[in-house]
């Protein structure tokens, strides 16, 4: 098994600002990392897969980067609608793991 450590657990952002979320893996997983957005009462939404590929229909304000053990999700031009909890999810051989989540609070 492997672990994903996500930081910070919570972050406050101003509208128009930038948010950076980090995800560190205990094993090198290449680019097998995805990012999800979760809002209350809604299923998780895939934002990024293979570390940096934007999922269909997702705003280019979301950017994924990294490989191996260090990954980053950057949200630029933060909007009120970005208030949510964000998770990284990695795959290592047959095993999958999620980070602990980052709550993004948007102040307008």
Curated annotation (Swiss-Prot):
Domain of life: Eukaryota
Keywords: Adaptive immunity, Immunity, Immunoglobulin
Record GO biological process: adaptive immune response
Keyword Transport: no
Span list, region Complementarity-determining-1: 24-34
A single Gene Ontology CC term: immunoglobulin complex
Annotated segments matching region Complementarity-determining-3: 89-97
Gene3D superfamilies (alphabetical): Immunoglobulins
Sequence segments annotated as region (Framework-1): 1-23
Positions of region (Framework-3): 57-88
Annotated region (Framework-2), positions in chain: 35-49
Complementarity-determining-2, as annotated region: 50-56
Region annotation Framework-4: where it falls in the sequence: 98-107
Keyword Glycoprotein among UniProt keywords: no
Listed PANTHER family: IMMUNOGLOBULIN LIGHT CHAIN
Additional remark text: This chain was obtained from antibody to Micrococcus lysodeikticus cell wall and was isolated from the serum of a single rabbit.
Name by which UniProt lists this protein: Ig kappa chain V region 120
Organism encoding this protein: Oryctolagus cuniculus
